[in-house]
Amino acid sequence: MAKLLKLTPTSNDSYVELKNIDNEYLNFPVHVFPKVIRDVINGLEKTSNFPAGATSASLLFLVSTIIGNKRKVFLKDTWIDGCSLWFAVVGKRGTMKTHAVDYMLRPINTKEIQFAENYEAEVRVFEAYTDEQKKEYFNETGNYEPVRKQMLVKNSTREGLEWLMYQNKTGIGMYKDELFGLFEETKNYSAKGVMEFYLDIFNGKIIIVNRRQAKPFTVENPFMSVLGSIQPEKMMIIASQYTDNGVVDRFLYVPTTDETPKFTLDDIPDVYKDSYTFFIDKMFHKFNNAKPAELTFSTESKQVVLARMGAFEDYKNSDDTSEAMSNYISKIITYFIRFTIIFNEMNDRGMVIQPESVDEAFHLCAYFIATGERTFAGFEAQSGLETICQRANAKTKSEMIKAIIKKIPNINTKTLMQFTGATKGLISQIKKV
């Protein structure tokens, strides 16, 4: 049984030990959020069957996108980071994950409509300017023409993302309903360059763009949070083709239930709609015109960070931790510090990271370690099934099913369906023989 970080009740513990996984850690820790958000997420799950993991990940994605480059955190001279977050919501079709994400992104979609209307109005005014007025416009804004403000992008090429980040200095959020397409981008045309591009964005490295028929430009502080959904069968493909891809272990995995909820006519109560809209509007107004600034850690918070880092390191270096999970923990540590920005800002705790923000970040990391264990264990299982089929020279669906059942008689039908792509009927037929 895999291990998990044991959560301690106070912030002053000098050591955090490891313990066995408990199912509670595979439920999204909604308790880390401010009460207004807890009530919204729990209410949406109860009234609309929206998975708490999907709504929570969507909220975190949205908050990180709103904050963007306006906040970084200073831990030490060699560790200054922002709050970009990459989420993969894993679930079958029809499990409400897409509906949950779409609902939580409504506020930003409303903003995008406003941005588009404002841009069109600015263009109409600009086009009526004289040459002298256009010069004055440049002197005042630094732009040769109006720039469309944008926070959310759904479909874009690498070139498009570079230009969007250049125009929108605060950063952007990318939502992909089918996240598998992003992994495909890192495999196809100019794959190496695309993969390095995404890794540079994740790490906030400067991007210098030089193209033959365009003026060069530089994105000094690239920022992009990512949210997408992916089906379990696509995860199987990722396990077989992308485990050496540096992009895979940058994602935080959010599993949702395989059960398809019963349809009801229950609507989302206005209290949840109003509370959520008010919270997001408040965050947006706070950061829309805010100047970039660095948060710092209080003396007490630094001690809590030190204790939690010790727990991560013990887990990472344990003989029971797989190589894949050991590598993944390094990324979790990165997210640990990024989460402190999110929680400090959501709770209006000022410009100094408070111990409560560190503990909330740690609780969230415990969840993602648990889901990471499950995800990477699935990758390892996938590799094992491939080895069985290769050794048996099994190529057709029937041959693969027979080879696997011979080696693993008790393997469940669901796993066989996901791995081979066979129907439940074919598998049952072969099992009876």
Regions inferred by a protein language model and the residue ranges of each:
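Phosphate-handling catalytic cores of nucleic-acid transaction enzymes
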Residues: 2-433
